[in-house]
A protein has these predicted regions:
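Positively charged n-region of N-terminal signal peptides that target proteins for export
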Residues: 1-4
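Short, linear, compositionally biased motifs with a strong N-terminal bias
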Residues: 10-11
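N-terminal signal peptide c-region/cleavage motif recognized by signal peptidases
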Residues: 14-16
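Flexible, solvent-exposed loop/hinge segments and secondary-structure transition points
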Residues: 20-165
Length: 165
């Protein structure tokens, strides 16, 4: 009788543990609109400090634009390119600078350049919190991808204390 009770207890404990870990939903972290705007403002301030007129976009973890700002003399194309850089970084889970190298002609991943919205030039980075990507930032309009990257990094740094990087 003891064996049956112990077996039943073990079976119930196993079933309870499985029931707790098997769910139909998943909880994720997302940037608030206030955090997205804070990052956009910081990135733009850094670009202005360097003398660049740019557009800055922040997208959520799904690539949907949360905040977008174009400086008054930034080119008409820069808001779209900034949003596409942020989208590319989030979608491919890596910086656009790294993707630029990995997708050069002759590389196995060069076909990615034909994906709509793919932007393989520096200036797109990811926000991470607790080991998960929670959004991306894209900057367009500085004279190089490296300069765009430096401004995007300022946007990420502005949220460093708010995110568990």
């Amino acid at each position: 009788m003891k064996k049956i009770l112990l077996s039943a207890a073990a079976l119930l404990a196993t079933a309870a543990a499985l029931a707790q870990t098997s769910t139909a939903t998943h909880t994720v972290r997302v940037l608030t609109p206030e955090a997205a705007q804070k990052a956009v403002n910081a990135a733009m301030a850094e670009c202005r400090r360097q003398g660049f007129q740019v557009a800055v976009a922040v997208v959520d973890r799904s690539g949907v634009t949360q905040a977008l700002l174009r400086d008054r003399f930034a080119g008409a194309h820069t808001p779209t390119v900034a949003a596409d850089k942020a989208w590319t970084a989030v979608s491919f889970r890596t910086s656009t600078t790294d993707l630029a190298r990995a997708t050069q002609a002759g590389q196995p991943s060069s076909g990615l350049r034909s994906v709509p919205r793919f932007t393989g030039v520096g200036g797109g980075l990811n926000f991470e919190a607790g080991g998960s990507i929670v959004g991306g930032i894209g900057v367009s309009g500085a004279p190089s991808g490296d300069a765009d990257d430096s401004c995007a990094k300022a946007g990420i740094a502005a949220l460093r204390d708010d995110l568990e990087l």
